Amino acid sequence: MEQHESRPRVRRGFLQMLSIAVVAIVLASVAGVGLGMAVAGQKCSTSQACWDPPYKKMPDIAPPIVRTNKYLPVPDAARGPAIDPVKGYRVESLGAGAFLVTEGVYQALLIVHADGVVLVDAPPSIGAKLSRAVAEVAPGKKVTHLIYSHAHIDHIGFAGEIAKSNPGVTIIAHEETLKLLARAKDANRPLPTATFAGVATPFSVTAGNQSLRLEYPGPNHEPGNIEIFHDASKTLMLVDVVFPGWMMWRRFALAQDLPGYFETVRSLNGKYDYKTLIGGHLNRVGTKEDVSTQLAFMSDLHAAAADGLATTKLGEGMSATDQTNAWAVFDNYIDRVTIHCVNAVTPKWKNRLAAFDVYIYDQCLSMEQSLRIDGPSM
């Protein structure tokens, strides 16, 4: 019982501390007074902004919008099998009629059944190659069902062409995805013809001799982003959440709900008996071990950002004049929290996750922001 009660107390104390800090900044700005700790900077014209060399203790990783001459090498473990340059895509059998299709950056799933093929997602980057992949694994068969993982164009933007070439195809999605697509009015993303509702409420899709379980775990990457499980092949597909072997795309892949994102990742390995994970991106499939690795990284990131927020002093190193600018004080504070976060996780993770250096600043920025406005995710 004591363990269950400790987290709310920590959360309240953490949020109270941040609220007091924000109020102090705003009051100082309104009153026109500094927060102390001013140091002399370079000489600047009073009519324009200027900036100094980087902060103290800057990581040896280039910060955002600074040109990088050479990125860290991609570990061999993060690379998938080579793509045939002539075909421009590859198909990987996952067993029991399930197949991965990828051009190296995006992924789709095919499930071959007695009467046709179930297609999960239709990334425009793969485009017409999807139809060639269907013909390769199921000659003469049509796509009978198209399942949308979620509403984003980069994952289902070729759905309109799939619908045209497969008349009568059943398009399935969560009702939250339907709402987003109805608002978008995009002919390249036809509205679902069948939907399901609810959170943590499994929905079964049967096609010929195959069946899939669809479930919306709750807010994560985007409202309506679902888990697709094919029990026969022990394949789980969840898009834009787990990136096997790689750093997540920028800002947790632009997750709209970070606490929900954390909970979704945390639940996967205990919830599903799977051996193969399709994350929707890059050129290899994942495993339960990949999920555990990403969760461990997320845990370290969470701790590093929280520690940075708690130990970084507001206004330190700023001129007295700039400390009357509430936005500037907080920008400076967040910069230094981010530097603390990056420095904390780099030694352990920079050689374990591909593209760590590409998006580590983005992840720290998202994490500190979520901690400030959502509270702890762990």
Task: Walk through the language-model features, giving the residues of each.
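C-terminal regulatory/interaction regions
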Residues: 15-16, 20, 32-59, 314-378
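Active-site HxH/HxHxD metal-binding segment of metal-dependent hydrolases
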Residues: 40, 129-206
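Divalent-metal (often Zn2+) His-rich catalytic cores of metallo-beta-lactamase-fold enzymes
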Residues: 262-326
